[in-house]
Design a protein with these regions (language model features):
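Conserved beta-propeller blade signature
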Residues: 293-297, 364-368, 402-406, 475-479, ...
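A short, solvent-exposed loop/turn motif at the edges and junctions
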Residues: 62-68, 90-111
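The canonical Cys-X-X-Cys-His
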Residues: 175-186
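Structural signature of eukaryotic scaffold interfaces centered on beta-propeller domains
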Residues: 269-290, 342-362, 393-400, 454-473, ...
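Blade-level signature of beta-propeller repeat domains, shared across WD40, Kelch, NHL, RCC1
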Residues: 538-539, 630-687
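Short, acidic Ser/Thr/Gly-rich low-complexity loop/linker segments typical of extracellular
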Residues: 36, 63-82
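Short, ordered, surface-exposed loop/turn motifs in non-cytosolic proteins
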Residues: 40-42, 48-64, 68, 88, ...
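Short Pro-Gly-centered beta-turn/loop motif in secreted/extracellular proteins
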Residues: 51-53, 82-90, 98
């Protein structure tokens, strides 16, 4: 045999061996080792042309139950998955993941092994259709820092009152605009529909029209005022660049503990309903209402409460009685420009605007409304109006069973139960800022909007958007909207109010932050946690303040050392320097009793623009995403322990789809809100 012949034989042999390896690899992929499942599970392996697909979602959905039911899990490092504990039904099962397009839906029932074939996205644009809204919103290019202060109508169209780029960004987030009501970056919001482009070849004109469309058209139009109509060009350019093919960066796939998350959704309410918040339990004792109903309030869209039974997989609605028929509507009743979904129909007809529910130690749900409070008792099946209860926006229970409200008022539940006198059980704390620094409240103080007199205290009003009582010292903390905004501490005993602003253009801080919305507390340490819409999750430790907490120098920016800013996940706006994210955060929450499985007092942040809730665990983010349907926007959240002896199955985090425009979600105008539970398994294959 010649050398050339031997080389040919060796080459052919090598190719044959390589072909055998490739063939066996494909055979192994097709005949993957079954995963361990029970009779109520579905399990298998997800592969694509690239091999096993790690960190992608497997969705199981059914409409066979009393309400639509969806359970989602994540594959492990070898592409394996287990969808656990499914109620008996026929399920559509498919794969969704970043870098993929949806696989075909496969019909199956629990107890079956089901290997799934994932589809690699044919183009980057096809893959990007599945990205969260905030990744698309991050393509927006805000005005450059040199555009500020604004120069008004005759200049750049931005009001002179907007002094910095941060103020402009804050106003397109949670400062009474845009992302306070819905996600920005969804397909509905980022693209200009073809018919609108035909009607308005100029994209600025198209955007001017679209912010006047539908039931919220008047509100959107007026909300543009603080940033000026000249700001429309930045949104128009955003849409034009996307239409021209610009794409966002790809989000990371779930890693680590993110792969252990099980997400369960139950459909409730109606396709025209705005569910603002829900509640599962008394957060002070999260075993209250174990396996019981999850209660949601339908704000603005109607005077209803939605109730989910997660055991029977059913939901119902309870109508609230309007006691004063002369009460005006909670939302405008005009449609400036017809909706592409609902036409001229006024789809929201509510008067009471139920806003926020909280459960007490007996499992009763207290609900704030425009005319005070409603009290829902799930066990008795009763709903009653509580005369004298202050009501309003948000509420929180202190350990002594006083309810504190965002208005700064309170309601003594124990006194009310003993006397039945609601008016006598309500109260408020008159307060001042201790400007003269003598440690006591000196009334009357100087006017809050007048010049500072260092010898006299300054008038103040307790209250804010969100609030939390401190169980360690009895103080009440509030978040106050604005740029930079603030958090305030009310001591009901001394009647003194302290004001702390996040560091903003402060030479003692390397970073600037602004616009608090939610607020909560570490129950063990008293450290405050605040979601800042500069794109940060911030902790504030009053014990770290080095200077005086009161006195003439304590004007807000006096304790930058008390703040720790954690940049939130996700990209920042294009061309914006510094840390932060284009995501928005309606509220945040601290898990006092390990209901989520990450440990006591784990701080959590609601990613209102990113289809997620997030846990900050040992300084690292765990992002819990709802991949289907796209457009999951939460506002508040809580956690419940149904069975402390049942491990991960006996506990979970709860929230609800709270997109004001439900029809912006994947599924369009037929899509209904959903109650959502997150559970943390020990592994992606735990059953």
């Amino acid at each position: 045999m010649t050398r050339g012949t031997r080389r040919l034989v060796l080459t052919c042999g090598t190719l044959a061996a390589l072909f055998l390896v490739i063939s066996m690899t494909g055979l192994n992929a097709r005949q993957a080792t079954p995963v361990s499942i029970d009779a109520d599970d579905i399990g298998g392996v997800v592969t694509s042309t690239k091999g096993p697909e790690a960190g992608v979602w497997v969705v199981a959905e059914t409409r066979d139950l009393p309400t639509r039911f969806i359970r989602t899990v994540v594959t492990d490092s070898r592409g394996r998955y287990v969808v656990p504990d499914l109620p008996p039904a026929s399920y559509d099962v498919w794969v969704r993941g970043y870098g993929l397009v949806d696989s075909p839906k496969v019909k199956t029932t629990p107890g079956k092994q089901l290997n799934l074939k994932a589809l690699v996205a044919p183009t980057p644009a096809a893959a990007a259709e599945y990205y969260p809204a905030n990744y698309w919103y991050a393509l927006l290019e805000p005005p450059a820092p040199t555009e500020f202060p604004g120069t008004g109508r005759k200049g750049n169209g931005i009001p002179e009152s907007i002094k910095t780029q941060g103020e402009w960004i804050g106003n397109i987030k949670m400062n009474l605009a845009c992302t306070q009501c819905h996600q920005m970056g969804t397909k509905v919001t980022r693209e200009i529909p073809p018919d609108l482009r035909t009607k308005f070849p100029n994209s600025v004109d198209a955007w001017d029209e679209r912010i006047q469309i539908g039931i919220s058209g008047a509100f959107m139009n007026s909300s543009l005022g603080p940033i000026g109509r000249g700001s429309l060009k930045y949104f128009a350019r955003w849409s034009d660049r996307i239409a021209g093919g610009e794409l966002p960066v790809a989000p990371p796939r779930p890693e680590g503990q993110e792969r252990n998350i099980v997400v369960t959704q139950w459909e409730w309410a109606t396709a025209k309903t705005f569910v603002h918040d829900g509640i599962a339990t008394d957060r002070r004792n999260p075993t209250v209402n174990a396996y019981g109903p999850y209660v949601g309030v339908e704000e603005l869209s109607g005077d209803w409460v939605s109730v989910l039974d997660p055991v029977k997989h059913s939901s119902k609605r309870i109508e609230l009685e309007v006691l004063d028929n002369k009460m005006p509507w909670a939302w405008q009743q005009d449609v400036p420009v017809p909706s592409r979904y609902w036409g001229d129909e006024v789809i929201w007809k509510g008067k009471l605007a139920p806003h926020n529910p909280m459960a007490d130690s007996k499992g009763r749900v207290w609900i704030t409304t425009r005319d005070g409070c409603r009290l829902y008792d799930p066990k008795a099946g009763t709903m009653r109006h509580i005369a004298g209860c202050p009501g309003g926006g948000h509420l929180q229970f202190a350990d002594d069973d006083k309810i504190w409200f965002g208005s700064g008022k309170y309601f003594d539940v124990k006194k009310w139960e003993a006397t039945g006198d609601g008016k006598a059980s309500a109260g408020a704390v008159e307060t001042v800022v201790d400007t003269n620094g003598n440690g006591k409240a000196d009334f009357p103080g100087t006017p809050a909007d007048g010049p500072v007199d260092p010898t006299r205290d300054r008038q103040a009003k307790a209250g804010g958007y969100a609030l939390i009582p401190n169980p360690l010292d009895g103080s009440i903390w509030y978040s106050v909207l604005g740029i930079p905004g603030s958090i305030t501490r009310l001591d009901p005993k001394t009647q003194l109010l302290e004001v702390y602003e996040p560091p903003f253009n402060n030479p003692k801080s390397k970073q600037s932050a602004y616009l608090p919305h939610g607020i909560d507390i570490d129950r063990a340490t008293g450290v405050i946690w605040v979601g800042l819409n500069s794109g940060h999750y911030a902790s504030f430790d009053r014990r770290k303040c080095q200077g005086p907490l009161n006195g003439p120098t304590a004007t807000g920016q006096h304790c930058p050392e008390g703040w720790t800013l954690h940049p939130a996940p996700g990209p920042n706006f294009k061309t914006v320097e510094g840390t932060g994210s284009a995501d928005s955060y309606y509220l945040n929450w601290v898990d006092w009793h390990n209901t989520g499985g990450f440990g006591n007092n784990t701080p959590m942040l609601v990613g209102s623009g990113s289809d997620s809730i997030m846990a900050l665990v040992a300084g690292k983010w765990v992002v819990m995403r709802v991949p289907y349907p796209r457009g999951f926007m939460a506002r508040g959240m809580d956690g419940r322990i149904d069975d402390p002896k049942a491990g991960w199955k006996g506990r979970g985090l709860w929230t609800t789809h709270s997109e004001q425009a439900t029809w912006h979600q994947e599924g369009g105008p037929t899509e209904r809100p959903k109650a959502v539970q997150f559970q943390l398994r020990p592994t992606p294959l735990a059953k």
